Structure formats: C-alpha cells, structure tokens
C-alpha cells in the first residue's frame, strides 16, 4: 500500500524513495520481523492453550524427542505467514501480478499444511490429510500458478527450461512446462516439509534460499543487470524481492522462538508454504535448476527418504539408520545443535554455488 505514496512525490520528493525495490525490500523485512516479535508470544500462548498436548511426537523416531519436544505447540507457520503477508501487502507493488501469484501459492500451500497440522493435533496422530488428497490439492494450486506464469510471461521464455552456466541455452517445453513447473513447486514444498525435523533446521536454510532468490529476482527483473550478467530478463519479477525480504524478516522473528529448545514448531503450515513460495519464485524468474543447487539441502533430505523407502521395498534393507537424513545423523550420535549448525553451513555453501551461476557463463 505504501507504494501508492509515489503519486505524492511531485509534492513531496522524499516519497520518491518508494520507487526503489531495494528500499521497499528492507521495509518489508523490518515489518515482517517486528510483526512476529510483537505478536509471536500471543500466537504461541493461544496455540498452546488450544492444542493442549501439542504436536504428536513420533514414537519410532529418536527417543530423545519424546522427552525434549513433547508438549511443544505446532502451526508456528502462522506467525511466519502473517508477518510475510503484512510485509508484502504493505510494501510490494499491488499492481504486480507476480506478487499475487506467488502469494497465492504460499497461502494456498499454507492452508493445506494448516489443515494437515489441525488433523494431527486434534487426533493426536501423525496421519493428517491422506497423501493422495494432499498432493492433488498441491498440484492443483501449483498447476494454476504455473499456467498463469506461462500465460503472463514472454514466449518462448515463459514456457522454457533455462540451463544455467550456458548463454541463451533453454529447452522450450511449450504448455508441458506447466506440468514441469508444478512438479518444481510441489517438490520444493514437500522437500522443505521433510527438512523441518529439528529446532531451527528448516527456517535458516529457507531464509538463505530466500535471500538468494531475492537477489536473483531483483537482477532478473532489471533489464540493465540482466543484460550485463547475460541472464534472462523477466519484466516485473524484481518485485518478488520484496516478498523475499518479508520472508527474511518473518523468518528471523520465528527463529527467535524456534531456537533450541523451541517454544513452537513451524509445522506443515509453515514448511509447505515456504517451500512452495521458493518453488514458485524459481519458476517465475526461470531459475528452476538453480533452485536445486541453492536448495540442495532440501533435495538431500527428500532424496534420502525416497532412497530409504525404495531400498526397503526392493531389498528389505535400509540405507540409512533413519530418514530423513538428519535423523540418520542423530542415530549416529551427533547432537541436535551439531546437525543443525552443520546443515546451515552446507546451506550457505550451496547458496554461494547457486549464485555463482549468475556470472559463470
């Protein structure tokens, strides 16, 4: 909404500052953080009161979790999504369609995760929405968003898969790109969901990825920078940096309460939404493959589950002591802080590797 203050810049030149995406990104970040810091304790108290026993803890998981995490409320994603939404609505350009598409995916996935969390908490079981139903809803949301992105963008770029490290190399998938894009968005959402298993483990890599894609969005949406770096220019996507800023701020606020020992868990409400947001931004700015690099930690977690399930069904043997892979390291004797901080370090290194694709061509 503050974007409209630009109209008053002829009378008040200071309002020209609202033209700059960088300024509004910083404003969205501060707004998201302040919102979560201010309302976080109230949200946590209400969730704890309404949930009673909190998130059910897996009895087949690490036994230490039964002692240290029992009774902790979930659905903390509500804090993040609230701060993210307020920051975005306050600072982003309301006429930019990319903002609304990505925000719709984020909140849509958040609703799916919220209902899943609600089912688990009320029934005190790990069985929330059935897998098929959940995937059907996710693919419907993601498919609609990707259709809009292809229709909105410039052909043939909008329907093409861009290959990093090479100049102007891309595969035009036509309308089949909608299906591919939907897989990227749904895959990202569920990969982040699988990563969210330890205090602070998911939110920091999500923020690292958001910062990276905030930069990529800004550069891809700026014709001068895009030409200099020889990346594909996607008009209008620079505004997505504001969403990334809002996520960074809300994520920092959430980490304050999610730092070990966590006062609240993100839950599917947050992990599905944030993963879906990263996936939809990657599709919008044509950096889907780069997402697999920057979000390599999420890919590793998801692949570990796929490998574990496939191996057990085919051979009756498990590759890992437990999946996702962060539980494997727990079973090997790593402490929770060791796993979390080491995974953060990996996330930083992967982000730097992904950002290197902007220049190495």
From Swiss-Prot:
PROSITE patterns linked to this entry: MRAY_1, MRAY_2
Biological pathway: Cell wall biogenesis; peptidoglycan biosynthesis
Reaction(s) catalysed (UniProt annotation): UDP-N-acetyl-alpha-D-muramoyl-L-alanyl-gamma-D-glutamyl-meso-2,6-diaminopimeloyl-D-alanyl-D-alanine + di-trans,octa-cis-undecaprenyl phosphate = di-trans,octa-cis-undecaprenyl diphospho-N-acetyl-alpha-D-muramoyl-L-alanyl-D-glutamyl-meso-2,6-diaminopimeloyl-D-alanyl-D-alanine + UMP
Residue intervals passing through the bilayer: 25-45, 72-92, 95-115, 135-155, 169-189, 200-220, 240-260, 264-284, 289-309, 338-358
UniProt keywords, alphabetically: Cell cycle, Cell division, Cell inner membrane, Cell membrane, Cell shape, Cell wall biogenesis/degradation, Magnesium, Membrane, Metal-binding, Peptidoglycan synthesis, Transferase, Transmembrane, Transmembrane helix
Superkingdom of the source species: Bacteria
One GO cellular component, as annotated: plasma membrane
Cofactor(s) needed: Mg(2+)
Protein name: Phospho-N-acetylmuramoyl-pentapeptide-transferase
HAMAP family in the record: MraY
Family: Belongs to the glycosyltransferase 4 family. MraY subfamily.
Source organism of the structure: Rhodopseudomonas palustris (strain ATCC BAA-98 / CGA009)
EC number from the UniProt entry: 2.7.8.13
GO molecular function term, any single one: phospho-N-acetylmuramoyl-pentapeptide-transferase activity
Protein's UniProt keywords contain Transferase: yes
Any Pfam family matching the protein: MraY_sig1
Cell compartment(s), UniProt: Cell inner membrane
Gene giving rise to this polypeptide: mraY
Topology of the protein relative to the lipid bilayer: Multi-pass membrane protein
Function of the molecule: Catalyzes the initial step of the lipid cycle reactions in the biosynthesis of the cell wall peptidoglycan: transfers peptidoglycan precursor phospho-MurNAc-pentapeptide from UDP-MurNAc-pentapeptide onto the lipid carrier undecaprenyl phosphate, yielding undecaprenyl-pyrophosphoryl-MurNAc-pentapeptide, known as lipid I.
UniProt cross-references to CDD domains, sorted A to Z: GT_MraY
Regions annotated as coiled coil: none
């Amino acid at each position: 909404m503050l974007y409209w203050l630009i109209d008053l810049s002829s009378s008040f030149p200071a309002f020209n500052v609202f033209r700059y995406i960088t300024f509004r990104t910083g404003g969205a970040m501060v707004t998201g953080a302040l919102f979560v810091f201010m309302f976080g304790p109230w949200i946590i108290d209400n969730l704890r009161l309404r949930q009673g026993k909190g998130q059910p803890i897996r009895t087949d998981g690490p036994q230490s979790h039964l002692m240290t995490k029992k009774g902790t409320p979930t659905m903390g994603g509500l804090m993040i999504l609230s701060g993210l939404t307020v920051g975005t609505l306050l600072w982003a350009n309301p006429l930019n369609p990319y903002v609304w598409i990505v925000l719709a995916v984020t909140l849509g996935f958040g609703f799916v995760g919220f209902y899943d969390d609600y089912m688990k908490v009320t029934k005190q079981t790990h069985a929330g929405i059935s897998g098929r139903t959940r995937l059907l809803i996710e693919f419907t949301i993601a498919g609609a968003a990707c259709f809009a992105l292809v229709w909105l963008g410039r052909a043939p770029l909008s329907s093409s898969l861009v290959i990093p490290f090479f100049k102007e190399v891309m595969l035009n998938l036509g309308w089949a790109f909608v299906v591919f894009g939907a897989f990227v968005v749904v895959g990202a959402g569920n990969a982040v969901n699988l990563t969210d298993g330890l205090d602070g483990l998911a939110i920091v890599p999500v923020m690292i990825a958001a910062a990276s894609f905030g930069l990529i969005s800004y550069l891809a949406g700026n014709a001068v920078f895009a030409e200099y770096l020889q990346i594909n220019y996607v008009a209008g996507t620079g505004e997505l940096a504001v969403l990334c800023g809002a996520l960074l701020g809300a994520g920092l606020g959430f980490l304050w309460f999610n730092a070990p020992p966590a006062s609240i868990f993100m839950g599917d409400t947050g992990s599905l939404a944030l993963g879906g947001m990263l996936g939809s931004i990657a599709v919008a700015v044509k950096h889907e493959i780069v997402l697999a690099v920057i979000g390599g930690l999420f890919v590793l977690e998801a692949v570990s589950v796929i490998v574990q399930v496939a191996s057990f069904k085919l051979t009756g043997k498990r590759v890992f002591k437990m999946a996702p892979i962060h539980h494997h390291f727990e079973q090997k004797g790593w402490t929770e802080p060791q796993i979390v901080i080491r995974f953060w370090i990996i996330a930083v290194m992967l982000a730097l590797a992904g950002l290197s694709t902007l220049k190495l061509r």
